[in-house]
Amino acid sequence: MAEEQQAHLEDLNDQMLVRREKMEALREEGIDPFGKRFDRTHNSAELHEQYDNHTKEELSEMNTEVSVAGRMMTKRGKGKAGFAHLQDREGQIQIYVRKDQVGDEAYELFKHADLGDFFGVTGQVMKTNTGEVTVKAQTITLLTKALRPLPDKYHGLTNVEQRYRQRYLDLISNKESFDRFMKRSQIISEIRRYLDGNGYVEVETPVLHNEAGGAAARPFITHHNALDMDLYLRIALELHLKRLIVGGMEKVYEIGRVFRNEGIDTTHNPEFTMLEAYTAYTDYQDVMDLTEGIIRNAAEKVLGTTDITYDGQAVDLGSPFKRLHMVDAVKEQTGVDFWQEMTIEEARALAKEHNVEITDAMTVGHIINEFFETFVEDTLQQPTFIYGHPVAVSPLAKKNPEDGRFTDRFELFIIGKEFANAFTELNDPIDQRERFEEQEKEREQGNDEAHGVDEDFIEALEYGLPPTGGLGIGIDRLVMLLTDAQSIRDVLLFPTMR
């Protein structure tokens, strides 16, 4: 153990060694370098809100005592007085420390403090000659000694990967990043508030599943030792939530982590946060209204506006979202009319003619979807509901009563990316079994995103699922949109890293 400790010390740079020497010196003086609780009367925002509008003379007359605490981010001064800025969650507050006010011992503590140390200060609110609200210290208390120096205050963390791996440093040194994560929390709170206010019940469903289902995705597999059985981390929330509609809960939602064993890029992380909501006695058109309401409300409440900018592109979340059938969208962009009945050979010929990559296992429905993804998706900059997906790519959606080739399903696209997926739920257990069996055949042919028959779910449907509208929204992508973040890693506190 002593050898390991010695090796660790040898790895430290000069600044770190000096800080450790200061820590030991504090201990020798009977001062705990890692402090204890401290009672604050104000955070920085409250202090500025209450006192910014007062003059220097008014504050001197008021002689108000406050207690503040935070991480020391700047320090200047020499001789018998100095200034510093303490940073808390809301921002920064300046402190003014004089030797003749705090005493020799406390002033020495301040004088030898390093940036990054935590302090608690009690004193009077004043204003400097430059008009900055400041706490003139009567007492100053070391709360935590930082043993490592912070990133350079002018350059911050320039290494993007380090920002993701050491998010705590990113939060300390990058206000934009800190504010984004505060907004993320507010966005999720507003989504909850909106759904709760509309009569939805928040529930929690299992993360470990016997059968992966509810989405076309490759799952993570784990093993339960006591039961000696493989289990899957959930790839969607859907199938358990629909069981609750069968059980009579009528309006339910869950915001939770979902796991997919797939690639990582600017919009995909192996674990991410989903909102799924299910409403009895509704259909996919009602769910369009719900989706619009959730997103518009989050923008209004958190940003104060529905006119936002993403990557330089203006996006209008306040106007009614456009609604367009997938086949019409493909026809607009390519001239190809998939409303016409056609054989698989004819569809393959069209794909070849338009350089659309397909596989032998694809049906006409799959090919329509490939046309959409190739030619249409990137063009959808303003909020657009694309509805009428083919049955082949929608195993859990109800068939359209007028045209059984398509489903009552929609996806919401903004800035060329998918933000929501929803449909009138398939509530016919016979049809559901057939679709599961089709999926099982696809899996046997090598499609590792297709899944088998979920007997327990079918049994639940046989007890009766009322007509139901279901919705899934990727929370991380929505936060990206509302905070103008270019990568999903910028909205995940601790993204998956190699």
UniProtKB/Swiss-Prot annotation:
Enzyme class, first EC level, given as a word: ligase
The keyword Transmembrane helix is assigned to this record: no
Enzyme Commission number, as recorded: 6.1.1.6
Residues that, per the record, bind Mg(2+) 2: E418
CC per GO annotation: cytosol
Main location, first listed in the record: cytoplasm
Keyword Metal-binding: yes
Cofactor(s), names only, from the UniProt record: Mg(2+)
Keywords: Aminoacyl-tRNA synthetase, ATP-binding, Cytoplasm, Ligase, Magnesium, Metal-binding, Nucleotide-binding, Protein biosynthesis
CDD domains, A to Z: LysRS_core (cd00775), LysRS_N (cd04322)
Molecular functions (GO terms): ATP binding; catalytic activity, acting on a protein; lysine-tRNA ligase activity; magnesium ion binding; transferase activity; tRNA binding
GO biological process annotation, one example: lysyl-tRNA aminoacylation
Stored PROSITE patterns: AA_TRNA_LIGASE_II
Segment forming the signal sequence: none
Subcellular location as annotated: Cytoplasm
Cysteines joined through disulfide linkages: none
Pfam families given in the database record: tRNA-synt_2 (PF00152), tRNA_anti-codon (PF01336)
Alphabetical list of NCBIfam families matching this protein: lysS_bact (TIGR00499), PRK00484.1 (NF001756)
Subunit structure: Homodimer.
UniProt family annotation: Belongs to the class-II aminoacyl-tRNA synthetase family.
Listed name of the protein: Lysine--tRNA ligase
Species of the source: Enterococcus faecalis (strain ATCC 700802 / V583)
